[in-house]
């Protein structure tokens, strides 16, 4: 019997190109096994139908994953106009039909109407939780749970291709935006139906699909080559301001103390903390009124020193 490779501490971010047909968790576990990593988590669920950018956080990077969940995203979506699906995408059954002879002008007007700050009701077929269970578990049993509308921002909808009943759009949006629901909203504005036949996440938090790696490509590399593709943990928080602390102040932070600090930094946002030799320590909060730094999320000392 062949012994399984031992799990090892891996710290960093992998930009994975999730294939169609796999759940986000299945793709995550495949990546974790390729790296023989002890711990891994992803930042934002993609439906099995969807493909594209899925940042995977190994080890200490998982501590900072939340800050990527809050980031804006971009997608390319393929719609079929004139048909409604039970799930909002091609995995469901067609449950209603209406006119599909939509003009480009009609479609453009509808896209413009759904651009900006809007309210969106999350779909039943989603991973949102109700009483500890994802909504899709209720939906599969025919149970409808009341969902509150959420405020989202659709920054832009660009029409990449249009040949009714097919339409391809590129969407830039805030976190929490459901492209299936957005597509249904566009169709509703025209007086018809629509569902997704393809969805690809192309950007998140400034990362692009061009930077990502497929599971197949990763499987063809050796361990050293794979490790070389990992991004450092601090890429997840690169949008925050940064500062440098001396070794004594860093030690105080790591011991739960609040070192004295005076610098012109905002007091209402996390701050990236580095040592004088450039090592990432973690995130801290600058308490400007008392000139102190308070630890928020810190790297494990051993991982930080590696």
Swiss-Prot record:
Belongs to the pseudouridine synthase TruB family. Type 1 subfamily. Keywords: Isomerase, tRNA processing. Responsible for synthesis of pseudouridine from uracil-55 in the psi GC loop of transfer RNAs. The keyword Isomerase applies. This is tRNA pseudouridine synthase B. The active site is at residue 47. SUPFAM superfamilies: Pseudouridine synthase, PUA domain-like. NCBIfam families: TruB (TIGR00431). The keyword Cytoplasm does not apply. Its EC number is 5.4.99.25. GO terms for molecular function: RNA binding; tRNA pseudouridine(55) synthase activity. It catalyses: uridine(55) in tRNA = pseudouridine(55) in tRNA. One of its GO terms (biological process) is mRNA pseudouridine synthesis. It comes from Neisseria gonorrhoeae (strain ATCC 700825 / FA 1090). The gene is truB. It holds the Pfam family TruB_C_2.
